[in-house]
């Protein structure tokens, strides 16, 4: 079963410090943490596509395994992948990719920004 737009918005929006906006026009909904993009939803496409930051090795493996995962347009193709949300990638793996994207972006933030995020979500 394919994950829907509402589920994707809700999941990305629940990440600590997550803010949504449309800096590229109303066809894209971008989720940022501390001003850095971790997910870009292509909301006018059907099925919906989401662009996520990925580890380069994992990206290569995912692209070989799942036709729904491709290099992202307009982003560095080594680090960013576009996922077509048509059920071609299992939902649990897609949610894990969102988590990974968020974590990779947070890892690249300044120490003070990471500390403020830990206050929001002290896990």
Where are these regions (language model features)?
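Charge-dense, helix-prone N-terminal extensions
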Residues: 1-123
């Amino acid at each position: 079963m394919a994950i829907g737009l509402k589920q994707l918005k809700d999941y990305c929006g629940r990440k600590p410090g997550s803010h949504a906006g449309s800096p590229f026009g109303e066809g894209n909904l971008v989720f940022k943490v501390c001003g850095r993009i971790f997910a870009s939803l292509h909301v006018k496409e059907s099925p919906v596509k989401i662009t996520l930051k990925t580890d380069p090795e994992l990206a290569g493996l995912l692209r070989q395994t799942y036709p729904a995962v491709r290099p992202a347009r307009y982003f560095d193709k080594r680090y960013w992948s576009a996922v077509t949300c048509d059920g071609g990638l299992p939902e649990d793996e897609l949610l894990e990719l969102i988590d990974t994207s968020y974590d990779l972006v947070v890892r690249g933030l300044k120490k003070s920004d990471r500390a403020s995020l830990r206050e929001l979500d002290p896990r």
